[in-house]
A protein has these predicted regions:
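Conserved hydrophobic residues forming the short capping helix/wall of the S-adenosyl-L-methionine
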Residues: 13, 107, 154, 227, ...
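Conserved SAM/SAH cofactor-binding pocket of Class I
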Residues: 94-196, 201, 222
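Core SAM-dependent methyltransferase catalytic element
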Residues: 254-279
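Conserved AdoMet
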Residues: 30-105
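Short alpha-helix
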Residues: 243-256
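Short loop/edge segments at beta-strand edges and connector loops
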Residues: 165-166, 241, 265
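Non-catalytic accessory regions of SAM-dependent methyltransferases
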Residues: 1-33, 37-41, 48
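Glycine-rich S-adenosyl-L-methionine
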Residues: 144, 200-232, 236, 242-244
Length: 279
Protein backbone atom coordinates (compact mmCIF):
# COMPACT_ATOMS: atom_id res chain seq x y z
CA UNK A 1 0.00 0.00 0.00
CA UNK A 2 1.01 3.60 -0.60
CA UNK A 3 1.05 4.34 3.12
CA UNK A 4 3.34 1.39 3.81
CA UNK A 5 5.78 2.47 1.08
CA UNK A 6 5.95 5.94 2.57
CA UNK A 7 6.49 4.62 6.09
CA UNK A 8 9.25 2.26 4.97
CA UNK A 9 11.03 5.01 3.05
CA UNK A 10 10.71 7.52 5.88
CA UNK A 11 11.94 4.99 8.43
CA UNK A 12 14.98 4.07 6.37
CA UNK A 13 15.90 7.72 5.85
CA UNK A 14 15.41 8.51 9.52
CA UNK A 15 17.55 5.57 10.62
CA UNK A 16 20.17 6.62 8.08
CA UNK A 17 20.54 10.06 9.61
CA UNK A 18 18.90 12.03 6.81
CA UNK A 19 17.96 15.43 8.20
CA UNK A 20 14.36 15.76 6.96
CA UNK A 21 13.10 12.19 6.47
CA UNK A 22 9.38 13.08 6.35
CA UNK A 23 9.84 15.67 3.63
CA UNK A 24 12.30 13.63 1.60
CA UNK A 25 10.18 10.47 1.77
CA UNK A 26 7.24 12.46 0.40
CA UNK A 27 9.42 13.84 -2.40
CA UNK A 28 10.63 10.39 -3.39
CA UNK A 29 7.15 8.88 -3.12
CA UNK A 30 5.66 11.57 -5.36
CA UNK A 31 8.52 11.21 -7.84
CA UNK A 32 7.95 7.46 -8.14
CA UNK A 33 4.16 7.13 -7.81
CA UNK A 34 2.79 10.57 -8.62
CA UNK A 35 1.11 10.78 -5.20
CA UNK A 36 2.12 13.72 -3.01
CA UNK A 37 1.00 14.59 0.52
CA UNK A 38 -2.68 14.99 -0.37
CA UNK A 39 -2.59 11.77 -2.40
CA UNK A 40 -1.06 9.90 0.51
CA UNK A 41 -3.90 11.07 2.77
CA UNK A 42 -6.67 10.36 0.27
CA UNK A 43 -5.27 7.16 -1.25
CA UNK A 44 -3.11 5.69 1.50
CA UNK A 45 -4.58 2.24 0.92
CA UNK A 46 -3.90 2.30 -2.83
CA UNK A 47 -1.75 -0.57 -4.12
CA UNK A 48 1.70 0.29 -5.46
CA UNK A 49 3.02 -1.73 -8.43
CA UNK A 50 6.06 -3.85 -7.64
CA UNK A 51 8.23 -1.99 -10.15
CA UNK A 52 7.46 1.29 -8.38
CA UNK A 53 8.21 -0.27 -5.00
CA UNK A 54 11.54 -1.51 -6.35
CA UNK A 55 12.41 1.93 -7.74
CA UNK A 56 11.50 3.61 -4.45
CA UNK A 57 13.74 1.19 -2.56
CA UNK A 58 16.57 1.82 -5.02
CA UNK A 59 16.31 5.61 -4.70
CA UNK A 60 16.06 5.36 -0.92
CA UNK A 61 19.23 3.30 -0.74
CA UNK A 62 21.05 5.76 -2.98
CA UNK A 63 19.91 8.67 -0.82
CA UNK A 64 21.34 6.86 2.21
CA UNK A 65 24.78 7.29 0.59
CA UNK A 66 24.09 11.06 0.85
CA UNK A 67 23.63 11.32 -2.89
CA UNK A 68 21.65 14.59 -3.23
CA UNK A 69 17.87 14.35 -3.21
CA UNK A 70 17.70 16.92 -6.01
CA UNK A 71 19.81 14.74 -8.30
CA UNK A 72 17.57 11.75 -7.56
CA UNK A 73 14.49 13.76 -8.48
CA UNK A 74 16.13 15.35 -11.52
CA UNK A 75 14.32 18.62 -10.91
CA UNK A 76 14.18 21.32 -8.26
CA UNK A 77 12.27 24.57 -7.89
CA UNK A 78 13.83 28.02 -7.57
CA UNK A 79 11.59 31.01 -6.89
CA UNK A 80 8.68 28.98 -8.22
CA UNK A 81 10.36 27.99 -11.48
CA UNK A 82 11.16 24.33 -12.21
CA UNK A 83 14.81 23.62 -12.97
CA UNK A 84 16.31 20.44 -14.35
CA UNK A 85 19.32 19.38 -12.27
CA UNK A 86 21.72 16.46 -12.19
CA UNK A 87 25.35 15.52 -11.80
CA UNK A 88 27.65 18.24 -13.06
CA UNK A 89 25.60 21.27 -12.02
CA UNK A 90 25.30 23.11 -8.72
CA UNK A 91 21.97 22.54 -6.99
CA UNK A 92 19.87 25.75 -6.68
CA UNK A 93 19.52 26.85 -3.07
CA UNK A 94 17.06 29.07 -1.25
CA UNK A 95 19.94 31.32 -0.13
CA UNK A 96 20.39 32.44 -3.73
CA UNK A 97 16.95 34.05 -3.63
CA UNK A 98 18.54 36.80 -1.50
CA UNK A 99 20.89 37.64 -4.36
CA UNK A 100 18.09 37.42 -6.92
CA UNK A 101 15.85 39.72 -4.88
CA UNK A 102 18.57 42.41 -4.90
CA UNK A 103 18.67 42.12 -8.69
CA UNK A 104 14.89 42.44 -8.95
CA UNK A 105 14.97 45.50 -6.72
CA UNK A 106 17.57 47.17 -8.96
CA UNK A 107 15.75 46.30 -12.19
CA UNK A 108 12.41 47.63 -10.97
CA UNK A 109 11.39 50.61 -13.06
CA UNK A 110 14.11 49.96 -15.65
CA UNK A 111 12.34 48.64 -18.75
CA UNK A 112 14.41 46.69 -21.27
CA UNK A 113 17.47 46.67 -19.03
CA UNK A 114 20.49 44.62 -20.11
CA UNK A 115 21.69 42.07 -17.56
CA UNK A 116 24.25 39.28 -17.47
CA UNK A 117 24.62 36.32 -15.09
CA UNK A 118 28.22 35.14 -14.72
CA UNK A 119 28.94 31.54 -13.60
CA UNK A 120 25.29 30.82 -14.33
CA UNK A 121 25.26 27.07 -13.61
CA UNK A 122 21.70 25.75 -13.89
CA UNK A 123 20.52 29.22 -14.88
CA UNK A 124 18.51 29.69 -11.70
CA UNK A 125 19.18 33.42 -11.38
CA UNK A 126 19.02 34.11 -15.12
CA UNK A 127 15.74 32.26 -15.61
CA UNK A 128 14.10 33.94 -12.61
CA UNK A 129 15.16 37.43 -13.72
CA UNK A 130 14.06 36.81 -17.30
CA UNK A 131 10.65 35.55 -16.19
CA UNK A 132 10.05 38.23 -13.56
CA UNK A 133 11.27 41.27 -15.55
CA UNK A 134 11.51 42.33 -19.17
CA UNK A 135 15.30 42.60 -19.05
CA UNK A 136 17.52 41.38 -21.88
CA UNK A 137 19.26 38.51 -20.08
CA UNK A 138 22.56 36.84 -20.94
CA UNK A 139 24.00 33.87 -19.02
CA UNK A 140 27.63 32.71 -19.13
CA UNK A 141 28.71 29.20 -18.09
CA UNK A 142 31.93 27.32 -18.90
CA UNK A 143 31.33 23.75 -17.72
CA UNK A 144 29.83 21.56 -20.45
CA UNK A 145 27.50 19.61 -18.16
CA UNK A 146 26.26 22.73 -16.42
CA UNK A 147 25.77 24.45 -19.77
CA UNK A 148 23.55 21.57 -20.85
CA UNK A 149 21.31 22.19 -17.83
CA UNK A 150 21.39 25.95 -18.46
CA UNK A 151 20.08 25.47 -22.00
CA UNK A 152 17.56 22.88 -20.82
CA UNK A 153 16.17 25.21 -18.16
CA UNK A 154 15.92 28.15 -20.53
CA UNK A 155 13.80 25.98 -22.81
CA UNK A 156 11.85 24.39 -19.95
CA UNK A 157 10.75 27.80 -18.70
CA UNK A 158 10.51 29.49 -22.11
CA UNK A 159 12.80 32.17 -20.68
CA UNK A 160 14.27 34.95 -22.80
CA UNK A 161 17.90 34.21 -21.92
CA UNK A 162 20.89 34.12 -24.28
CA UNK A 163 23.27 31.35 -23.11
CA UNK A 164 26.99 31.70 -23.80
CA UNK A 165 29.43 28.84 -23.19
CA UNK A 166 32.59 30.66 -22.18
CA UNK A 167 34.98 31.49 -19.34
CA UNK A 168 34.12 34.58 -17.31
CA UNK A 169 37.84 35.03 -16.71
CA UNK A 170 38.38 35.90 -20.38
CA UNK A 171 35.11 36.47 -22.23
CA UNK A 172 34.76 40.02 -20.91
CA UNK A 173 36.91 40.87 -23.94
CA UNK A 174 33.95 39.94 -26.16
CA UNK A 175 31.74 42.69 -24.72
CA UNK A 176 31.83 46.43 -25.19
CA UNK A 177 32.16 48.74 -22.21
CA UNK A 178 29.14 50.42 -20.59
CA UNK A 179 26.48 48.04 -21.94
CA UNK A 180 24.96 46.32 -18.89
CA UNK A 181 22.57 47.69 -16.29
CA UNK A 182 23.18 44.68 -14.06
CA UNK A 183 25.95 42.13 -13.62
CA UNK A 184 25.16 39.32 -11.19
CA UNK A 185 27.17 36.31 -10.13
CA UNK A 186 26.94 33.44 -7.68
CA UNK A 187 30.60 32.49 -8.18
CA UNK A 188 32.62 29.66 -6.66
CA UNK A 189 33.54 31.01 -3.22
CA UNK A 190 34.66 28.11 -1.04
CA UNK A 191 38.33 28.04 -0.04
CA UNK A 192 40.09 25.17 -1.81
CA UNK A 193 41.28 23.73 1.50
CA UNK A 194 37.71 23.69 2.85
CA UNK A 195 36.20 21.59 0.06
CA UNK A 196 36.87 18.21 1.76
CA UNK A 197 35.12 19.46 4.93
CA UNK A 198 31.80 20.27 3.23
CA UNK A 199 28.76 18.15 4.02
CA UNK A 200 28.57 14.78 2.31
CA UNK A 201 25.83 15.82 -0.11
CA UNK A 202 27.91 18.73 -1.40
CA UNK A 203 30.78 16.36 -2.19
CA UNK A 204 28.67 15.07 -5.09
CA UNK A 205 28.38 18.55 -6.62
CA UNK A 206 30.95 19.83 -9.16
CA UNK A 207 34.08 21.21 -7.51
CA UNK A 208 34.43 23.75 -10.33
CA UNK A 209 31.23 25.39 -9.10
CA UNK A 210 32.49 25.54 -5.51
CA UNK A 211 36.26 26.14 -5.56
CA UNK A 212 37.03 29.83 -5.12
CA UNK A 213 40.78 29.32 -4.86
CA UNK A 214 43.09 29.49 -1.87
CA UNK A 215 41.36 32.53 -0.38
CA UNK A 216 37.87 31.89 -1.74
CA UNK A 217 37.95 35.29 -3.44
CA UNK A 218 39.48 34.47 -6.84
CA UNK A 219 36.28 35.02 -8.80
CA UNK A 220 35.21 38.16 -6.94
CA UNK A 221 38.59 39.73 -7.63
CA UNK A 222 38.63 38.74 -11.30
CA UNK A 223 35.04 39.75 -12.02
CA UNK A 224 35.41 43.14 -10.36
CA UNK A 225 38.71 43.78 -12.12
CA UNK A 226 37.56 42.73 -15.59
CA UNK A 227 33.81 43.30 -15.72
CA UNK A 228 33.22 46.60 -13.88
CA UNK A 229 33.81 48.63 -17.03
CA UNK A 230 31.09 46.61 -18.78
CA UNK A 231 28.53 48.21 -16.47
CA UNK A 232 26.83 51.44 -17.36
CA UNK A 233 27.28 54.23 -14.84
CA UNK A 234 24.45 53.71 -12.38
CA UNK A 235 24.47 49.99 -13.10
CA UNK A 236 24.65 47.42 -10.30
CA UNK A 237 27.02 44.59 -9.49
CA UNK A 238 25.45 41.87 -7.33
CA UNK A 239 27.18 38.86 -5.79
CA UNK A 240 26.18 35.96 -3.61
CA UNK A 241 28.54 35.67 -0.64
CA UNK A 242 29.94 32.93 1.52
CA UNK A 243 30.22 33.27 5.28
CA UNK A 244 32.50 36.07 6.51
CA UNK A 245 33.19 37.34 2.99
CA UNK A 246 31.12 40.53 3.00
CA UNK A 247 33.72 42.95 4.36
CA UNK A 248 36.44 41.93 1.91
CA UNK A 249 34.15 41.93 -1.13
CA UNK A 250 32.76 45.33 -0.09
CA UNK A 251 36.33 46.66 0.05
CA UNK A 252 37.03 45.25 -3.42
CA UNK A 253 33.92 46.99 -4.72
CA UNK A 254 34.87 50.32 -3.16
CA UNK A 255 38.31 50.06 -4.76
CA UNK A 256 36.61 49.68 -8.15
CA UNK A 257 34.57 52.83 -7.61
CA UNK A 258 31.28 51.33 -6.46
CA UNK A 259 29.06 53.29 -4.09
CA UNK A 260 25.86 52.61 -2.14
CA UNK A 261 27.27 49.21 -1.23
CA UNK A 262 25.07 47.14 1.05
CA UNK A 263 24.51 43.54 2.03
CA UNK A 264 21.42 41.44 2.66
CA UNK A 265 21.03 38.66 5.20
CA UNK A 266 19.72 35.17 4.54
CA UNK A 267 17.25 33.44 6.86
CA UNK A 268 20.13 32.25 9.02
CA UNK A 269 21.46 35.76 9.60
CA UNK A 270 24.48 35.42 7.29
CA UNK A 271 25.38 38.29 4.97
CA UNK A 272 24.49 36.33 1.84
CA UNK A 273 24.41 38.92 -0.95
CA UNK A 274 25.97 42.27 -1.75
CA UNK A 275 25.12 45.04 -4.20
CA UNK A 276 27.01 48.12 -5.31
CA UNK A 277 26.31 50.86 -7.86
CA UNK A 278 28.91 51.96 -10.39
CA UNK A 279 29.38 55.73 -10.28
Amino acid sequence: MLRDCYSACRGALQNGGIEAPDFEALCLLEHVTGYGRSGLIAHGDAPVPEEQQALLRELTQKRLTHYPLQYLLGEWSFMGFPLSVGEGVLIPRDDTEVCTDLCLEHLKGKPNAAAIDLCSGSGAIAVALAKLTDCHMTAVELCEKAFYFLETNIELNQAAVTPIKSDVMSCFLDFEDDIFDLIVSNPPYIKSADLPTLQKEVQFEPSLALDGGESGFDFYEAILCNWTQKLRHGGAMVFELGENQAAYVAALMRNQGFENIRTELDFGGTERAIIGIRQ
